[in-house]
């Protein structure tokens, strides 16, 4: 095995360079052709059953509205019943002919089973699962009073998503359906002051990349990597810590529209805003430069706002 490893160490670097110079242009051309083809074959979601977690606000709420405009049937999941009722009514007004709400907590495995069971009981099928539920917290890792305080971030962001995905898979196989995972740009790029959050999103990214291979070709998986979006989850943290929402952010409605377009085209990855894709590439090609830039941003602009007790 050591000999094989040595051979790979010697061969892969030059072969990779040869591939990049000789074959990568053809790869990009194929990608362009496939992109044009996807734009011509947008998925018709009318009367398709879509379950959305974290649907009471933010990206989940606005993605629900985009589906509603196209006539999809919706199962809306979140903890806040009052907010779900408002989103459901708005979705009906926008064009959804059938909307149900299922209050509950994605970090509770029994609730996740209930979400799927009630959706199937009401609609008889499931076509799209939009895994959007998540929580965000800005804190220096060493400033956790009790390290256990970080558990809810992983419980909701990672385990909550895997629980409901597990129960949804048999039904999505029947419908040849789709899973959409709303992760974060922090899954690929370090996010100072949100280490546990970034770790939870990185775990989701690798989980769904692996699951995509396991479930292919029966179930398609789209992974979304948004940047900072102006939502109820992120904006209060910026105001509390920095006095204003100064971080470069995108409106939630614009982000949701881009996500919906990407889902309809059958994209495997959706980076929104699109410039983040190039930041991810730079991180892979010259990681030290990206790390230096993030460190400068953190030390110069962010860290001074955090006063240690």
Swiss-Prot record:
It is an enzyme of class 1 (oxidoreductase). Gene3D superfamilies: NAD(P)-binding Rossmann-like Domain. Substrate binds at residue 184. It comes from the Eukaryota. GO terms for molecular function: oxidoreductase activity. It is found in: Membrane. The keyword Disulfide bond does not apply. The active site is at residue 197. It is a single-pass type II membrane protein. Its EC number is 1.1.1.-. The chain crosses the membrane at residues 10-30. GO terms for cellular component: membrane. PROSITE patterns: ADH_SHORT. Keywords: Lipid biosynthesis, Lipid metabolism, Membrane, NADP, Oxidoreductase, Signal-anchor, Steroid biosynthesis, Transmembrane, Transmembrane helix. NADP(+) binds at residues 54-80, 105, 197-201. It holds the Pfam family adh_short. One of its GO terms (biological process) is steroid biosynthetic process. Its main location: membrane. Belongs to the short-chain dehydrogenases/reductases (SDR) family. This is 11-beta-hydroxysteroid dehydrogenase-like 3. The gene is HSD3.
